[in-house]
Amino acid sequence: ALGFYVMDEADVECHYNQNLSSNSSWITAMDDRTKRMVLRDRNHPSVIFWSLGNECGGGSNFSTTYNTCKNLDSRFVHYEGAGSGTNYSDLGSNMYPTVSSVGGNRSGLNGKPYFICEYAHAMGQAVGNLKEYWDQIEGSTGIIGACIWDWVDQSVYDPARLVSGQKKSENGFNYWVSGYDYNSTSGINYGFQGNFLNNGIITPDRTWTGKLSEVKKVYQNVKFSDFSASAKSVNIANKYAFMPISSDNFEIAYRVMKDGRLVEEGTLASFQTIAAGSSATVTLPINTAVDKSAEYLVNIELRIKKPTNGAADWTTWAEEGYSIADAQFSLSEQNISNGTAMGTDGTMGFPVLPSYTSAGGSLQVENNTVTGTDNNGKAYSIVFDSSGKMTSWTYDGKDLINAGPDFNSYRKVDNDRGFSPSFSNSSSLSITRALAKSGNNAKMSVNGSATGCSYTIDYTFYPDGTVDMKVTFSPSETLARIGLGMQFASGFENVEFYARGPRSNYSDRKTGSYLGRFTTTVDDMVDEMIHPQTFGDHEDMRELILTNKASNVQIGIKAGGRASFSLSHYDETKWCKSGDSMWNTKLHWYDLTRYQQVYAHFDYMQRGLGNNSCGGDGCLSQYQCPSSGSYTYTLRFKPQSAESVNVVAE
């Protein structure tokens, strides 16, 4: 029932010294390791083929070790040899291919079954476009699988601190070290290789990450499709080779959410057995009446349960109720007038903000300042300088911001190794429509010019303190992100959001992150990778609520159009450097200063992660930020007392 397929590889690794495989003095050692492996493991049925080693070149020593395997056992033998092991392998194999090259080898490689022995290099913020790889693999006739490099970050605690019992910094970061904390030899990376020991989809302490969420989703062997919102039915395809999906050891569960809040949940007590390699359509007993006032979503899960009738027992490795496969679909009718969205699994639509009318309050304008009182009698004030930059925003006498909105394109991750965009977090501003009353409201427009992008912000101020920012970006070069940055005041630590989550996700790594309503803190939104880099993005933003418990003030933000967000207490300019300079530093999370203010990004688009920290694709074209055209979103801000209902203005 555990179902592991194992490639068993001999401990033969030359790496930088690949000429050893052509040196006859090494034949005995290489052959001995290979022979002992086969003799040790050949009675394990989970071993489906052998591998002669890794990155040792294509020398003739492998003729000997290949024949040793074949003389001892009949299973296939694999060897990649950094691209030069074709003559000693029953499989076609390579490392870190691009998605397009995988697509070109869907019938096999070198006339043999194709095995991708390393791909999706998972160093840092990574595992982009995994879905696109598997679209090719699952649509092939000759590809047998692929291995992510690799499972776990292999950092250790700083030995100097560990001896005195220090594992974590004052800010809660682990004192993990990487190769950069050790000296290289003769200026070459022998023995340490910088951050290359940290390629895992989980952290050194085995913490789940957004990378693992994506892998779990893309790799799941049960697929949900063809959901009918009217019939409440879904097709379930069993991609397992041998195992049936039966109500004897699984249950199908569903949860219905209205604007991210749970309104119904249930399970199918029984369903028809789905044989391996087949599919069936099931109907869910959903009772929720769907209207056009909200976004309705349904999450469907295949969960493990205690077996009956002699079925395989999956609870030997996971708790009862654990989901081995899931999907999310929209129940809403598409209606752009009220912000509902309709899409298929992984491609939900973007929200649309309805027009807004203030329910009470009063508003005054003087020079570049908006003041007023909301419908709860709380005073507010918003101040701009002569260029149109927001310099102050208060509510009930409490500061809401530390710095107003400005263009921000800072973004750097390990996979940006071959990508060196311009960075900017400030712009030249000018007022194009002076602040003035417009009926009961007030309006103001500002133009901004930053490196690689111009933009406009059209402000609408409502008497109850609600503020709309309609932002239009016009990029002129390929940037890492297109969006606004701003700083909220100290104390806005508690977070509720309606977006993809709960873990970080990106445009090309969001298949395994579903829309939902989640609660957390700004500190807990850090992705603690060993090497500091951009983190915490949440795609398909609908709503964000920040609460300052000390001042009893809450800021609600709703998005209209394409938008994502991230929050942080750390200054990204400390690690976002041009070129490959971030690859040559000892910087750790615990070296960074935690600031009291909250750095916020509201992006129209952030570049996908890709796979370029080691081979692969830098970023697929559909996930790259546009370099021309105009792109718009609207952010609707509503300050209120924290004891008020947690609903942003509709």
Predicted regions and their residues:
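A generic structural signal for short, non-catalytic loop/turn and secondary-structure boundary residues
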Residues: Y5, G85-N87, L109, G194, ...
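An acidic- and aromatic-residue-enriched active-site/binding cleft used to recognize and process polar
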Residues: D11, L52-E55, A82, P97, ...
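Solvent-exposed, well-ordered amphipathic alpha-helical segments
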Residues: S25-K35, L52, G58-K70, Y79-N87, ...
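Carbohydrate-binding surfaces of carbohydrate-active enzymes
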Residues: Q136-M390, M469, V645-N646
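Beta-strand/loop-rich accessory regions of lumenal/periplasmic or secreted enzymes
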Residues: P285-S293, T308, E333-E650
